[in-house]
Structure formats: structure tokens, C-alpha cells
Design a protein with these regions (language model features):
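Short polybasic amphipathic segments
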Residues: 55-60, 125-128, 152
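Forkhead-associated
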Residues: 71-148, 155, 163
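Intrinsically disordered, low-complexity acidic Ser/Thr-rich regulatory segments
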Residues: 1-97, 147-148, 158-166
Length: 166
């Protein structure tokens, strides 16, 4: 009898790492942080260490859909993973009754501890509303770092909030 064939091991994609300091509840935070970004506890002085990239934000679409940002997230009315350089991007589908939102409208991706939003040459553009209420129209293809609390206005009355992780 021949031995049964074995399947080739499936390689899990490796998650990127970041330098971090941990609070007493082991939440990862950017080096130099005084308080935890999750629980607000004081962070004791400590050397930074490499940790897997944590969830940096939650994207809350006005249709109720939510995506975690721990890898690139493509947002649109029918987002296609082909529009990202990432091996396995998250897809966040939003409604667009008038088809004013592009199929793959924009990408929100982690870059270290930053969140980089890129308009993917959308037809009707992307408007950002920062936490202090300032608005900014992105140019097609423009990439910007966005803070937590930013609202992303797409079209058709659809918006996405860049919210704090839980």
C-alpha cells in the first residue's frame, strides 16, 4: 500500500509588525504614547517591542457595515480586490442607488501606526471632514494620512466614519 497523499501546507499570510508599547491590559500602542489608545490607562515607561499590527480603526459606513483596519480596506459599491496591491484586502460595500459611488472608490490602509486614505481615481471624488470640522476634497489618486474621527463623504449621501478601535 502506498501512503495517502498529503496536502501541501497552506501558508498563512504574514501580518506586518509595528513597534509598540503595551498598557497593563496588553493593548499595543505607538512608542512614546502616555495613555492607551483603547482603555486610556497610563502606559509605564518601557522599551518598544515588535507586535503584529493591531486593528488601528473601525470604518463605520452609513449603511451599518463595519470593517476593521488591520490591513488595506477597499470601499465602494462593488469593491474589487484587484484594485489593491495587498494580497488579501478587506472589502467594504456601500450602497449607491444613483451609482455615484465608484465600484472601488477608495482605499484605507495602515502604514505603521498611520491610516492612509487614497482616492482610487473615483468618478465623483472623495471629501474628508476632519474631527475639527474642516473639509477637504481629495484629488483623484491623492493619498493622505487621516486621523481617527474623520468622516469620509463619498456620494449619494453615503459616508464612512474612521472610528476608534474597540
Amino acid at each position: 500500500m502506498w501512503p495517502a497523499p498529503t496536502a501541501a501546507p497552506v501558508e498563512e499570510p504574514t501580518r506586518p509588525t509595528v513597534q509598540a508599547v503595551l498598557c497593563v491590559s496588553d493593548h499595543p500602542n505607538p512608542p512614546g504614547a502616555a495613555r492607551c489608545r483603547i482603555c486610556s490607562d497610563v502606559i509605564a515607561a518601557q522599551p518598544a517591542r515588535d507586535v503584529p499590527l493591531p486593528v488601528l480603526a473601525l470604518l463605520r459606513a452609513s449603511n451599518g457595515h463595519v470593517a476593521e483596519v488591520d490591513r488595506p480596506v477597499l470601499i465602494g459599491r462593488s469593491p474589487s480586490p484587484d484594485r489593491s496591491d495587498a494580497a488579501d484586502p478587506e472589502l467594504l460595500t456601500v450602497t449607491s442607488p444613483s451609482h455615484d459611488i465608484s465600484r472601488t472608490h477608495l482605499e484605507v490602509a495602515p502604514s505603521g501606526w498611520d491610516l492612509v486614505l487614497t482616492d482610487l481615481h473615483s468618478t465623483n471624488g472623495t471629501v474628508l471632514v476632519t474631527p475639527d470640522g474642516k473639509t477637504r476634497q481629495l484629488d483623484p489618486g491623492e493619498a493622505v494620512v487621516v486621523p481617527l474621527g474623520t468622516a469620509i463623504e463619498l456620494a449619494d449621501g453615503v459616508s464612512v466614519l474612521v472610528d476608534y478601535p474597540q
